Design a protein with these regions (language model features):
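Enzymes that bind and transform nitrogen-containing heteroaromatic metabolites
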Residues: 2-175
Length: 175
């Protein structure tokens, strides 16, 4: 894969990851974390969001205030309010162009596991909500290699009234 997005437009992976690495179960989030959904909105609003088809289907509709770019191997997949492509490099080009038009300097990559794994080598930053729970799941975030990433910001929060578990928000930058 070529590097389609110039370094001036950061690639940021945004995910909620359980202590056991789980990010999904049966094409849905494996936990309820209302406070994290607010953080997710803050991190992605006004930016292009890049995701796989299954992630888009789990959300169920385009995220408002963001250009929704969906990567799918299914050539017949389409939807209103989204840009669909089968090519990840093209998706990054579209996201980069959208970021420039919007006057923002980053692309938010929001899943799923295959997209995270493929873009981890190109990512500039990780915005991870570490959910302190161990749910069953069938989808996992790729390992965060401590030789490649360092935590630059961290805050712990207890479970709120509409959260299933306490969390630690961590921003990782390249080591």
């Amino acid at each position: 894969m070529s590097v389609a997005a110039p370094r001036s437009i950061a690639i940021v992976l945004v995910a909620a990851v359980a202590d056991n690495g789980v990010i999904g179960r049966a094409n849905a989030l494996p936990f309820r974390q209302s406070s994290d959904l607010k953080r997710f909105k803050t991190l992605t609003m006004g930016r292009p969001v890049l995701m796989g088809r299954k992630t888009f289907l789990s959300i169920g509709k385009p995220l408002p205030g963001r250009t929704n770019i969906v990567v799918s191997r299914n050539a017949g997949f389409a939807g209103a309010g989204i840009v669909v492509t089968g090519n990840l490099d093209f998706a990054l080009d579209v996201a980069r162009g959208d970021a420039l038009r919007r006057g923002v300097n980053e692309i938010a990559v929001i899943g799923g596991a295959d997209i995270f794994t493929r873009l981890m080598p190109l990512a500039d930053r990780l915005e991870i909500t570490h959910v302190h729970a161990r749910p069953e799941g069938d989808t996992h975030f790729p390992p965060i290699d401590a030789s490649q990433w360092r935590a630059i910001e961290q805050s712990e929060l207890p479970a709120g009234p509409r959260d299933e578990a306490p969390v630690t928000y961590v921003t990782y930058a390249r080591a």
